[in-house]
Amino acid sequence: MASCSFSGHQALRRLRASAAAAASAALAAVATTPLLSSGTRTALIGTGSSCPGAMWLSTATGSRSDSESEEEDLPVGDEVCKRGYLRKQKHGHRRYFVLKLETADAPARLEYYRNARKFRHSVRAAAAAAEAAASGAAVPALIPPRRVIILYQCFSVSQRADARYRHLIALFTQDEYFAMVAENESEQESWYLLLSRLILESKRRRCGTLGALPDGEPAALAAAAAAEPPFYKDVWQVVVKPRGLGHRKELSGVFRLCLTDEEVVFVRLNTEVASVVVQLLSIRRCGHSEQYFFLEVGRSTVIGPGELWMQVDDSVVAQNMHELFLEKMRALCADEYRARCRSYSISIGAHLLTLLSTRRHLGLLPLEPGGWLRRYGLEQFCRLRAIREREEMLFTRRFISPREPPPPFRRGRGHLPRARRSRRAASVPPSLFRRSAPSPGRIPQPEDVPNDRAREASGSSSGNTEEKDKEGEEGNRGDCIPMNNWGSGNGRGSGGGRGSSGQGSSSQGSGGRQGSGGGQGSGGQGAGGNQCSGNGQGTAGGHGSGGGGHGSGGGQRPGDGHGSGGGKNSGSGKNSDDGDRGKSVKKRSYFGKFTQSKQQQTLPPPPPPPPAAGATGGKGKSGGRFRLYFCADRGTKERKEAKEVRDMETSGGATRGPYRARAFDEDEDDPYVPMRPGVAAPLACSSDYMPMAPQNSSASTKRHSRSPFEDSRGYMMMFPRVSPPPPVPSAPKAPDTNKGDDSKDNDSDSDYMFMAPGAGAIPKNPPNAQGGSSSKSWSSYFSLPSPFQSSPLGQSDHSEYVPMLPGKFLGSGLHKEASFSQGTKNVSSKPSTEASFSKPEDKGSSAKPSDDVPPMNKAKEPNHLSFIAKGTQVKPKPLNPTQERREAAGSRDYINIDFIKRERLVLPSSAQGLPDMRGVVTDPAPTAFSGYLNVEFGVPFPNPTIRLSDLLRVLPGANSIPLAGTRWPFPGSAIGSIVEAGEYIEVIFNPAMTPAMSFADSAICYDAQTGQIYVVDPFSECCMDVSLSPGRCSEPPPVARLRREEAQERRRPQSRSQSLFASTRAAVSAFPTDSLDRDFPAASAVIAAPAEAPLLAVSRALAVVSALAAAPSIGDVFAGFRAAAGVDSASARGFQPVAGAQAVREFQDLAAGWNPGALNHRARGEDLAAGAAAPPPPPRQIWVLRPQERADSEDDDDDDDDIYVRMDFARRDYRK
């Protein structure tokens, strides 16, 4: 027994020894087997433009985690690359992860098991299955892992840290974010390198680009880089919130935020295609708040300017994102982004001036993203002066020849590659693209030139030739444009350069609020904004808007180079020590070196400084104003320069320089610019720009005083006026040959119409012989139709718009122009009474009995809308009626609606007699020919006794109406000082208004109880209510309103169809005459006698309704009308035609049976034989077009219910 047991123990030892030897051999083989062949280069992660740079990986070998124990050592095969324990981020569970290489039957993958024992069981089961498959035995069941992640399907992998774990490996799959927690940093690095390498290789293999990188041609390298699959080193999964750009551009949702060396890429979940790419140069600022990270991008991005807010896991991740973004931005352009992170926005003025100047005048200097202006090489440099408020700007552009040495500020950086030179925003006002000569009235004194040069040196960021090695390298590490401070050195407006804004900084416009680091560039409201900061060796306090801080201004002493401490009270460069000396000692001493060295340089002739407002003790205003110069009249350059030189000589040099055309009000700090005529004077220079300044010009105070066309509140009352405008006030000018340039603004044949203010502000200048305007420079005469452009205003006819000219017809064509030049007496005394509409010429009749006059200029369309508002003091300028004006009217397209305030005496009701008719309201419906209706009332007949036949004879299509012996007298009445022979109403309709329906489409009915006339249109189920209530003429002309009655409160219940009919009826309230004292007793008898007479049908008008308004016994008239028409009183009373459809049909049948053509000659014969005593029968039936629906109504409930029609309710007054 003992021997057997001993032999068994010996065998077991031998088996264990052999197993251990085999295991050690396998592990040695795995440890010495590389993942890639030794001749193959390792994978480059980050090639191409979309990858984060070059990260070379050393040859990785298989290794084991420190957590693996010896008992876990077993042969696992060559496919296992790395294995070990890691924790899951979500719950912190410890799992056993295994990274496997790609094999013939499986891709590269990451697996994890519950623990190492499970992994060993799976390995043994896999080995047993392989043996069974080889021997043909039964294959045992395999133990699958908990999860398998295919690496080529992963988006990327990244190292991460959050509030809970410091060593995270974040693996981004197609649809999720999977993070693992390592024990230490080395473990994290090892897993990250292997995962990133295997992911990239798997992607390359899938894309067919796996292999050695091509050598030789750059094109081959570029093609290989373009074929590289996207792989990003720094990736975060964020949730873009619907705020800012996320809301406007619909970018909200889950994204992968990928950061590279030059751009930020947003990739949506479940895709690898970039949704948005933002250049790092376009990022204005970035930051984080709690668990939110935000980016503010500029307008050069594809999504426009705005903010992107993203939610991440926690605040630590947001902070890490912020820091990494800043690191990338600093690495890309340290100087630029240091300035941007502190002050990311450019002031409005500087940015606008940059765009204007660079686009119009710097064609060789292209704009780069965000509006930054890039300057190239040594081919040219720009010398800028940007001085705010009381300082002018000078731009001197000088080309440097190849033999000429570069300027001092360019030295020390010429060896830099162009791509690494920082970009600068150059604010170039357009007014500086001219060379200014010294004023002939004042030659700069010798002590002024070094003073100006010292001020130039204080604003520039350059060193002298002696300080090139010492200070040139410090102060000019970037491409900084010198900021020359010519003039008074206004402390708050000077800026830029090494002294006031840090080493190597350059200011936008007039400098900016500078900090110790030289990065404060926005400058508050001013046109400032430092776009480049150096190493921050400058000291500046940043006072106010755009200022260079206390003591940063110029104003150097002539000889010693010590500044005045400019500050906010700096003066005109004459040692006004008003600023804070304590803060500017260092700056003055720093500027002194430039003062002494710059005096030896050759400079362009400096312009004389502007008036010194700070020297008087006043605080310099900045207010954030900037100046824009737009096109001015070049023809007045010499004249204005001579005038300003003369003014400068008389003022003793207070305003020095021809370019100084205006000054600002020192007591006003209004940031708003009034855009009204006559406020800012054009510059007296050769520039193409006109100043739109916020303040009046002190040099031309008399020329541009407060405009007479504004009321007490400062509003401009602009509408066309009859009276000519006043000439533009101007200052005395020197007599020269260019005097004619001013007169062309006042030509009567101008292309503009004077838009004058309201009542009380019209100058009393006499009109010219043509009655036209005397100025064209105040407002444009927009696009008037042809009849108006031949008016007294002297325009040509080439438009289709209707001017709203008060109380005045503007004529109907060029043939009318002679009638307007009858002199001042006729123009100002008689109102216009000409009827502008007539019958069609093919019918052979006109609006008046004079039908033999041929029409003139039929194409001219005297369409007008004339009215005078209440309280207007300008009298109309009418003309006497002429036959030419009556005949010239062809086809019309507009409604002639006149509102004229009548100046008359309110007479007693007993002595007034029959007053003038106030018209009828009609609203045209769309017809087959025209959508407009021409209606004009008030053209008198030469006979005091007006015949109704003559009245209705003007209606096209109404010639066949039997009007035998019909005369309605309209006796004249004295109204004020104007006596007219007769009063009447004349309705002239558009010939194009051919009805689209039959005459029987509408019926008219009179309600005896309410005294109203209803015109019913059965097709539209709409009726027009014409009120005949007496009114007073003293009231202003009313406005007739078509309205739909919301609630119908009739006397009896209505059926469903009747309710619908009643609910859609529109009431037209035409306010009638003063009183209805006249009676026509024989009206009912005359109407009832000819029973066989057909029902009177007047197409397209309510003229008879107007005539009915003159009769007080309208009830009797309509009683006879109903008897003749066969309509019972029950159906006609109380608006029965609206409620009863049968009565309406009777009206239609009667009208349908009438033959207009057959009765045409009969009506004419009756008219010839008719006597003058019998009054005409009032009309029994008329029809009107249904009111036109407004297609542009936005509110179907409200807009369709309110239809307004303006009518003419006034009488034309004449002196026979």
Curated annotation (Swiss-Prot):
Residue ranges of domain PH in the record: 79-200
Annotated compartments: Cell membrane
Keyword GTP-binding attributed: no
GO biological process: insulin receptor signaling pathway
Motif (YXXM motif 1): 480-483
Coiled coil (UniProt feature): none
Compositionally biased tracts (Acidic residues): 1192-1202
SMART domains (UniProt xref): IRS, PH, PTBI
Compositional bias annotation for Low complexity: 773-796
One of the record's GO cellular component terms: plasma membrane
Protein name, per record: Insulin receptor substrate 4
